[in-house]
Design a protein with these regions (language model features):
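N-terminal capping segments
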Residues: 196-279
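Surface-exposed, charged secondary-structure patches
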Residues: 91-143
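Core segments of small alpha/beta cavity-forming domains
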Residues: 24-102, 220, 258
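Hydrophobic/aromatic beta-strand elements that line small-molecule binding cavities or substrate pockets
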Residues: 113-119, 155-162, 331
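...with weaker cross-activation on analogous glycine-rich loops/strands in unrelated enzymes
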Residues: 106, 117, 123-124, 273-343
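Low-complexity, Gly/Ser/Thr/Pro-rich intrinsically disordered linker/tail segments
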Residues: 343-346, 357-374
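Short beta-strand edge/turn micro-motifs at domain boundaries
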Residues: 22, 146-200, 342-347
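Sec-dependent signal peptide cleavage junction
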Residues: 3-29
Length: 374
């Protein structure tokens, strides 16, 4: 399976974590977004594109090799904020390594495509950079190494690079974090889970026309489409609600209406600029779909409780993610991997055919697996 880590300008929902001084504040992001600086210089962009491609290549290699030590070349661990930035990135890299062990898979041939949006010289030798990154991950199950799977993930990066001798180091970094709710893997790693996953096979699946159109729409407008014409793009008919707190339910509603031909009504509606709670809000969307009879439960609970039932999901169904008693995210199932593991497509962070639990591994996360009646 291939993961593409894509940094997308349409993904701008900001979540701050510990050690914020190693990350960007909201004001710093606004300042960098509004600065002209050297952003119009294609020569400067090309210079930093090469530097960042090397950075992301090393990060990818760390995931493939299972060795976070490879990340250290891009940080000065004697500088506190650079050390914190390294520790944050190492923790996320370790999560990917841990997830692959849980899943009994091996990553291979990761590749990143970096698109520089802006470079600003903040002071002599210190540059603020906004970039979009597309990283393709391949992985295979260890019992079937000849079968390669693929998916894509979108993120948007804000990075401070400081000249340090003959190289640049990262002093600050923030990006739309697909793993913010996923850094605790100890609660789900077990031989029982691994054995069950590798015992499965992808089911036969023949979607009707409505469902196929919904899948096609999801893959086209997810923000990380494999069609280069639509990469980093949403459907312009709809407002991007990421800056308002999230666009996941809006996109799930679009998939049903634009792709699946589900009709709008008074409760579930969008007028071109704004929508109802059932259309735009993750909790409201889940409640509406169940209450209206357009969908029904498959299972709900933490990962250990639902991972077997998840193999009953089919494209067109959706996963609602619960945190602290509230539904905070919606993803639509649009495919399977080679073991029949459900793959989801969504906005914020933009995902294309990503394993449904990747990025949602903390013990306080509950999954609502919901079947849609096409």
């Amino acid at each position: 399976m291939l993961i593409t880590l894509i940094s997308s300008p349409v993904s701008k929902v900001i979540a701050y974590t510990e050690k914020e001084s190693s990350s960007f504040t909201k004001d710093e992001i606004k300042t960098l977004e509004s600065s002209s600086g050297t952003g119009t210089s294609e020569k400067v962009k090309a210079e930093f594109k090469g530097l960042l491609e090397k950075l992301f290549s090393e990060r990818n290699e760390a995931v493939v090799c299972g060795d976070c030590e490879l990340l250290k070349n891009f940080y000065d661990l004697n500088i506190k904020v650079s050390l914190w930035a390294y520790e944050s990135e190492a923790k996320k890299t370790q999560y990917l390594i841990n997830w692959s062990e849980k899943q009994y898979v091996q990553f291979k041939d990761l590749k990143s495509n970096v698109k520089i949006r802006k470079v600003v010289e903040k002071e002599p030798g210190l540059f603020g950079i906004i970039c979009d990154v597309a990283t393709d991950f391949n992985y295979y199950y260890l019992d079937s190494p000849d079968v390669i799977n693929h998916f894509r993930l979108g993120t948007n990066h804000y990075i401070n690079l400081k000249k340090n001798g003959d190289k640049y180091i990262i002093t600050k970094e923030w990006y739309t974090d697909p793993f913010a709710d996923s850094l605790d893997m100890d609660n789900i790693k077990s031989d029982e889970i691994k054995d069950y996953i590798i015992s499965r096979n992808a089911p036969e699946f023949n979607p009707n026309e409505r469902l196929q159109n919904a899948i096609n729409y999801a893959h086209k407008y997810c923000g990380v489409s494999e069609d280069e014409e639509f990469t980093f793009k949403y459907n312009s008919k709809y407002k991007n609600h990421n800056p308002d707190g999230g666009d996941c339910a809006n996109f799930a509603s679009q998939i049903l209406h634009e792709g699946g031909n589900f009709k709008k009504n008074g409760a579930w509606n969008y007028d071109g600029k704004d929508g109802t709670k059932a259309w735009l809000n993750a909790q409201g969307f889940k409640n509406y779909m169940l209450g209206s009879g357009r969908a029904s439960y498959i299972a709900k609970g933490n990962y250990n409780k639902v991972y077997k039932a998840a193999f009953n999901m089919r494209p067109g169904d959706f996963v609602a993610y619960e945190k602290k008693g509230r539904i905070t995210h919606i993803s639509t199932v649009t495919g399977f991997d080679s073991k029949g593991y459900p793959l989801v497509t969504c906005h914020n962070t933009d995902r294309l055919l990503v394993p449904y639990d990747l990025g949602w591994s903390n013990s306080n996360i509950k999954f609502h697996l919901i079947h849609v009646h096409y």
